[in-house]
C-alpha cells in the first residue's frame, strides 16, 4: 500500500483552510480560515518550507 504525506487546501464554510494528511488521516490543520486562497497557500508554503528538520519540543514535563 502506497500512502503518501501531503498538504491539502480545502474549503470550509466558503473560506480556505489547509491540512497535512497521511493517506486518509489528518495529522495537522490550520487554526485559521482564510477568505483568500492565495493567503492560505502562502501560509501553507511557509509551514511546508520551514518545518523540515525542526526539533520536537515536549512541554509536558513527563519523562
Predicted regions and their residues:
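Short N-terminal "domain-start" leader segments
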Residues: 1-15, 29-30, 46-50, 55-58, ...
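A short, exposed loop/beta-hairpin motif centered on an aromatic-Gly-Thr core
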Residues: 25-36
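Residue-level recognition of oxygen-bearing side chains
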Residues: 39
Amino acid at each position: 500500500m502506497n500512502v503518501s504525506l501531503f498538504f491539502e487546501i480545502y474549503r470550509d464554510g466558503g473560506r480556505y483552510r489547509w491540512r497535512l494528511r497521511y493517506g486518509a488521516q489528518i495529522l495537522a490543520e490550520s487554526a485559521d480560515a482564510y477568505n483568500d486562497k492565495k493567503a492560505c497557500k502562502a501560509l501553507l508554503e511557509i509551514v511546508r518550507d520551514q518545518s523540515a528538520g525542526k526539533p520536537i519540543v515536549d512541554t509536558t514535563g513527563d519523562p
